[in-house]
């Protein structure tokens, strides 16, 4: 059996969508709790978001390693998401969650431009859905607390 990296495998789909469980679960719990428990859950959501954002940047290092002539700009971009995610942990939780929503979409738009270069356009549909659900999960507790 040949492994085609140009489109998501069943395993990639399962892991990608499985990775949404902490986003959706923590976000839902944040909405239905309050006080100290809610703050702990919000920070857990923020920490998980930072982890995923760091992974999204690291993908670009992997792509660059496949090139015969490494792209310096792609290497620089590869560390920007992790640095931005780290900064999001320094601010108050609500601001951090909003920043992470923006970072997730920035990562998606960079991928939208980068993936076709590597014949990986078939991954973009999954990336869009994952980004949409993850960003809504980060934003939902903010919106819910605002309307209360």
Segments (PLM) and residue ranges:
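Hydrophobic alpha-helical transmembrane segments
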Residues: 29-30, 83-92
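Alpha-helical transmembrane segments and their membrane-interface exit regions
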Residues: 54, 102-114
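Interfacial loop-to-transmembrane junctions
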Residues: 113-135
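Juxtamembrane boundary at the C-terminal end of a transmembrane helix
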Residues: 140-148
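Short juxtamembrane and helix-loop transition motifs at transmembrane-helix boundaries
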Residues: 3-7, 34-42, 55-69, 91-94, ...
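Transmembrane helix-loop-helix
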Residues: 89-106, 148
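The first (N-terminal) embedded transmembrane alpha-helix
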Residues: 9-31, 132-137
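Core segments of alpha-helical transmembrane spans in multipass integral membrane proteins
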Residues: 17-24, 44-87
């Amino acid at each position: 059996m040949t492994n085609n990296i140009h489109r998501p495998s069943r395993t990639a789909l399962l892991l990608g969508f499985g990775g949404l469980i902490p986003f959706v679960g923590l976000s839902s719990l944040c909405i239905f709790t309050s006080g100290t428990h809610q703050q702990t859950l919000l920070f857990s959501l923020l920490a998980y978001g930072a982890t995923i954002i760091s992974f999204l940047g690291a993908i670009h290092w992997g792509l660059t390693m496949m090139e015969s002539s490494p792209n310096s700009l792609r290497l620089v971009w590869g560390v920007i998401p992790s640095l931005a995610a780290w900064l999001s942990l320094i601010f108050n939780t609500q601001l951090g969650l909003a920043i992470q929503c923006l970072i997730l979409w920035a990562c998606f738009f960079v991928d939208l431009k980068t993936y076709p270069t590597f014949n990986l356009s078939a991954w973009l549909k999954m990336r869009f859905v994952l980004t949409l659900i993850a960003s809504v999960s980060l934003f939902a507790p903010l919106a819910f607390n605002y309307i209360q």
